[in-house]
Regions:
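The feature marks the mature, well-folded catalytic cores of soluble enzymes
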Residues: 1-165
Length: 165
């Protein structure tokens, strides 16, 4: 999925969670960008806060993404509880096109600039895919230490509304 605007992002999230979980419910952090999304347009029912046991889908907003490695970077704290990144069965991440950087060096420069501007976050997560391990008898196991599935939705717009095209 690639969304052209906020409505497209909401539609992509709604379609994905319904196809995989037959639900319109998810948990989203207290990020103001997520709160401003037109969730009702797609019938999505977000609960804002930290993931609780039994809730399979969490939604986050990436601070940036690194093209070279496919990594998304999230800062943890009140706006993005660590549990949402690490404990859900399925983690969905929205990434603004304006927040895409070419490589790790540019990623670290951006992280340092964000920290200088906003202060140090509780934690920094660099996520490159769903959790997996092959430690047990050499057999690949998904979801061993985190989400079994990971879905990134790039958005071709700045949150402020200006298109990057």
């Amino acid at each position: 999925d690639c969304a052209a605007d906020r409505s497209g992002a909401v539609a992509a999230v709604g379609k994905y969670i319904y196809e995989h979980y037959r639900t319109h419910r998810l948990v989203a952090g207290n990020d103001s960008r997520l709160a401003a999304m037109p969730w009702r347009d797609a019938g999505v029912l977000p609960r804002f806060g930290a993931l609780e046991p039994g809730e399979p889908v969490a939604l986050s907003y990436a601070r940036l993404a690194i093209a070279e490695t496919g990594v998304v970077v999230t800062f943890t704290g009140r706006a993005n509880p660590a549990a949402n990144n690490l404990l859900s069965e399925n983690h969905i991440v929205l990434v603004d096109g304006a927040d895409l950087v070419p490589d790790m060096e540019a990623g670290w420069a951006c992280i340092n600039a964000l920290i200088a501007e906003e202060g140090r976050p509780r934690g920094i997560n660099m996520i490159a895919g769903p959790s997996s391990t092959a430690d047990i008898e050499g057999k690949l196991v998904q979801g061993a230490h985190g989400p079994r599935q990971w879905h990134v939705i790039p958005c071709r717009w700045f949150f402020g509304g200006d298109s990057i095209e």
